[in-house]
């Protein structure tokens, strides 16, 4: 009887070891500095991305804008779903605006969702932000050709989002388990970043204020297409 108990325990330990060996390792993370490090200079990871041109019209006058989206260079063509990441979102004037205009950013909405050929997964939202900037002293943040407004968007891992996990497994399913990078990439080809910038244009001559929006949709591939 004692021998049977030992044999059962060994079998159970073997099963645990096999399961542990099959578990997918955590995805690669951003560079982190050890808190015990004596290094004082912080080295930012190289960022790469895309710039987009926009034109808004106020009282028949055109204003040129440039939006910019950058991510860690290592993830440029290898978007990672299961590790938090940061996308730098920014906007500025591309050309000088009329002198009587003060242009400010008053709101930024952004979200990241899955891009997939399967309707069940396509559009499933990973994370989002909605920033009301009207509480700033001037009712927003001024931008010019030399001064942009930049907002780092810290995108949470899909495994930090309970709604995403339920959506991936099916809302009516009772199955709940953390998702692996391998499984998500098997059913998707990347992520889509959508942004809406709300701008306030103040005419200092007439004392009127106008509101305009510009939006972008940016595809971030998670692997090269075969």
What is each model feature region?
Residues 100-139:
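Extended low-complexity, serine/threonine- and proline-enriched intrinsically disordered segments
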Residues 160-206:
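Internal, hydrophobic beta-strand segments that form the core of beta-sheet-rich folds
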Residues 35-82, 86:
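Low-complexity, acidic Ser/Thr/Pro/Gly-rich terminal tails and inter-domain linkers that flank the onset
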Residues 73-86, 97-102, 182-188:
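Short, solvent-exposed beta-strand/turn "edge" segments of beta-rich domains on protein surfaces
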Residues 127-177:
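Extended, solvent-exposed segments with strong compositional bias
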Residues 204-226:
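Short beta-strand elements
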Residues 18-21:
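C-terminal motif of bacterial Sec signal peptides marking the signal peptidase cleavage site
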Residues 23-25:
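Bacterial signal peptide processing site
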């Amino acid at each position: 009887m004692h021998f049977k108990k030992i044999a059962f325990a060994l079998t159970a330990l073997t099963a645990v070891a096999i399961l542990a060996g099959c578990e997918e390792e955590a995805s690669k993370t951003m560079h982190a500095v050890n808190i015990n490090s004596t290094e004082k200079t912080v080295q930012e990871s190289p960022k790469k991305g895309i710039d987009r041109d926009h034109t808004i019209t106020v009282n028949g006058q055109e204003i040129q804008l440039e939006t910019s989206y950058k991510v860690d260079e290592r993830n440029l063509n290898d978007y990672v779903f299961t590790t938090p990441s940061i996308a730098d979102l920014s906007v500025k004037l591309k050309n000088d605006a009329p002198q009587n205009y003060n242009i400010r950013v008053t709101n930024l909405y952004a979200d990241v969702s899955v891009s997939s050929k399967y309707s069940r997964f396509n559009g499933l939202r990973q994370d989002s932000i909605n920033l009301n900037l009207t509480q700033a002293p001037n009712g927003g943040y001024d931008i010019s050709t030399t001064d942009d407004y930049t907002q780092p968007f810290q995108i949470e891992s899909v495994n930090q989002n309970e709604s995403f996990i339920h959506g991936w497994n099916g809302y009516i399913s009772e199955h709940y388990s953390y998702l692996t990078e391998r499984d998500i990439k098997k059913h998707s080809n990347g992520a889509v970043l959508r942004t809406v910038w709300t701008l306030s244009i103040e005419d200092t001559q007439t004392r009127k204020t106008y509101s305009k929006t510009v939006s972008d949709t940016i595809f971030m591939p998670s692997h090269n297409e075969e």
